[in-house]
């Protein structure tokens, strides 16, 4: 067998080259079969055995990817160097016809002398001076520590931070929004350091469908004041599917299929067309960054849906933490 880093040489001159080393993975995600009500509708490869074979094949040709089997035969733990590397693998699999469910990226901790250590990234940022305040504020809230600041005198500033790798999950899109697309962000792996403390993965809740059906414009119009919606009229939904971002920190169950009641009464000004706000398409990267620990992304060749890990509202109620 030949492995990455091996040297092929003559028998009488066995002089191996310096072996190549690959950085240890810092992020892990759970890949599993889809158990949603729409399972098998859009994907042609849904079996756990096929998903396992595909992941093993990926580890053989991509040395930065590792795969471990879990206590469940339908769930696989995939490790890599970052959430974008994971997103590339998932996107490749969906284009090959796979249908699967993935969880939120989780950092891989190490323990030394009983102390928990976490991966730390060195973060380089180049942005306009006008955005320095909001960038610094948000990175500080994510346990980032400023290491250096250089003002070029040209209206742009360079910032350097050391920050936990988990804090960068979902931050890149937010950074581009805060800097109006003009900011530049780069990172490199610095090493492991002491755990810097907890912080919320997201400051908003989810709007969760309480039934299966098709979304109706009337229902979505009435739900718009509650937050940003991810679906349009006519899109299929099911119980436990996340179809919007709640303005507040808590989750709410809602009915996106509710139709307007018809009656013989006709009132002036009640028949206007319903006008909905534009829906921002849910990309794979955005979905992976958006979900929380109790949520998952359902990936098919045609759709990307957000859902709760426990679809039943009663099941989620029973599992909620008790005070």
Indicate residue ranges for each PLM-predicted region:
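Accessory interaction regions appended to the cores of large information-processing enzymes
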Residues: 1-323
């Amino acid at each position: 067998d030949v492995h990455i880093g091996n040297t092929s040489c003559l028998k009488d001159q066995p002089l191996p080259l310096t072996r190549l080393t690959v950085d240890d993975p810092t992020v892990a995600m759970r890949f599993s079969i889809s158990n949603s009500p729409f399972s098998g509708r859009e994907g042609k490869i849904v079996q756990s055995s096929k998903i396992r074979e595909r992941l093993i094949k990926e580890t053989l040709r991509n040395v930065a990817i590792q795969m471990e089997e879990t206590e469940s035969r339908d769930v696989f733990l995939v490790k890599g160097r970052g959430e974008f590397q994971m997103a590339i693998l998932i996107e490749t699999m969906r284009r090959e016809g796979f249908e699967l469910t993935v969880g939120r990226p989780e950092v891989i901790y190490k323990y030394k002398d009983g102390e928990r250590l976490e991966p730390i990234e060195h973060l380089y940022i180049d942005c306009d001076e006008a955005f320095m305040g909001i960038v610094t504020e948000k990175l500080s809230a994510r346990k980032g520590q400023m290491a250096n600041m250089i003002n070029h005198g040209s209206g742009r500033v360079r910032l350097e931070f050391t920050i936990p790798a988990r804090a960068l999950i979902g931050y890149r899109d937010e950074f581009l929004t805060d800097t109006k697309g003009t900011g530049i962000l780069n990172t490199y792996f610095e090493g492991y350091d002491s755990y810097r403390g907890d912080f919320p993965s997201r400051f908003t809740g989810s709007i969760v469908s309480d039934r299966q059906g098709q979304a109706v414009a009337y229902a979505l119009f009435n739900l718009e004041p509650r937050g940003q919606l991810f679906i349009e009229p006519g899109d299929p939904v099911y119980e436990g599917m996340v179809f919007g971002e709640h303005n507040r920190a808590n989750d709410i169950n809602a009915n996106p299929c509710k139709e307007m009641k018809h009656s013989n009464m006709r009132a002036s000004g009640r028949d206007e067309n319903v006008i909905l706000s534009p829906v921002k398409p849910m990309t794979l990267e955005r979905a992976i960054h958006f979900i929380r620990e109790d949520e998952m992304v359902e990936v098919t060749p045609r759709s990307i849906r957000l859902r709760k890990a426990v679809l039943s509202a009663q099941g989620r109620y029973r599992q909620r933490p008790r005070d």
